[in-house]
C-alpha cells in the first residue's frame, strides 16, 4: 500500500532508486566490498579472499530480504548485513567488516547517495538554467510594466526579469560545485574516530577506501561524519527551491486575470481548469512546485538538530535523516523539473 505522496505522486524514479531500501543496501554492500579491497591492497587480506568478497557483496547474493531476517533477531542493521555477508562468504567471511564500526558503513553509503543525488540535481539545475537563458534571450525586447510595492513603476523588459532569475540560478550552480567536495564525504576511522582498530595504517586505509569509492576524505571525524556537511546540502536545496518558487510566484501573479501578461501554457483541447468554472486556466504546476518548495525548506530545521549529537555520537539523528536527506533531495529535483516545464510552456 502506497502511503507517502513520494510513492505515487512526486519525485522521479532515479531519486527513489538512490534513496530506496534497495539503493541503501546496494551502496552499503559496495562500501563493505571497498573495505576488504583496501585491506587487500595493504597486504592484510589475500587476493583469493577478496575475490570471494567481491563475488558475494552484491544484492543478488546478499539479499535485502536475508539481511532483514537477521535484523529481526539482532535488532542491528549493520550487524545483520555483516552476518549475511559472512554467511555467504564461507571461509573468507573472517575479513568482512574488518576493523570497521557501523557508521563507517552507514555514513559512507550515505556519502555515495549524496554524490549520486548531486549529479542528478546538478543536471536538473543546468537544464533549468538553459531554459531560463532561452526565455531571457527570446523576450529581451518584450517591454512590460515594472512594479514596486505591488504598484506600477516604470517599464522594464520581460527579458530582464528572466535574466535576473538566470543570474540567481547560476549562483546556485557555483555554490553546488563549491560545496560538493565537502558534502560527498565518507569516513573509515572506526569506533569514536580514532582508527585504533586499524592500527598504524588507519588513515591510509581510509584514504584507499574513500578514493576508491569516489568520495572525499575528511581530516578528522568522531564516530560519524560531521553533520555540518548535511546541513550545507539541505540548505543548498532549500535556497535553490526558494529561487524556483520566486520565479513561479512571479508567473502566478502575472497570470492573474487583471494582469494577464504571462502565464503557464494550457492545453485547451485536453486540460480542465475547474469542474465548475469552464473559463478557468489555473497555474497548477507553479502552485504545485511552490508547495513542494515549502516542504524542502522545512527540512532545514531538523538538519540542524541532527548535528547536535552527544559526545562522539548518538543515534538521535538516524531516524530523522531517513526523511530529511531522501525527501528533500527528491522534492528539490521535482521543483527544478517543474519550474523548467513551466518556463518552457509559458506564454508572454
Roles of regions detected by a PLM:
Residues 133, 137-140, 181-184, 252, ...:
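Alpha-helical coiled-coil oligomerization motifs
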Residues 162, 206-226, 233, 237-240:
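Conserved beta-strand/loop scaffold segments within soluble protein domains that form the structured core
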Residues 34-38, 84, 88, 131, ...:
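Generic, well-ordered alpha-helical scaffold segments in large soluble proteins
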Residues 172, 176, 190, 223-317:
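Glycine-rich anion/phosphate-binding loop at the beta-strand->alpha-helix junction
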Residues 47-50, 261-266, 337-348:
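A glycine-biased, small/acidic residue-tolerant capping/turn segment at secondary-structure junctions
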Residues 295-348:
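Long, amphipathic alpha-helical stalk/connector segments used for oligomerization, subunit docking
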Residues 1-189, 195-196, 201-208, 217, ...:
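A helix-coil-helix interface module used to build multimeric assemblies
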Residues 115-122, 126, 133, 163-166, ...:
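Short amphipathic alpha-helical segments with heptad-repeat character
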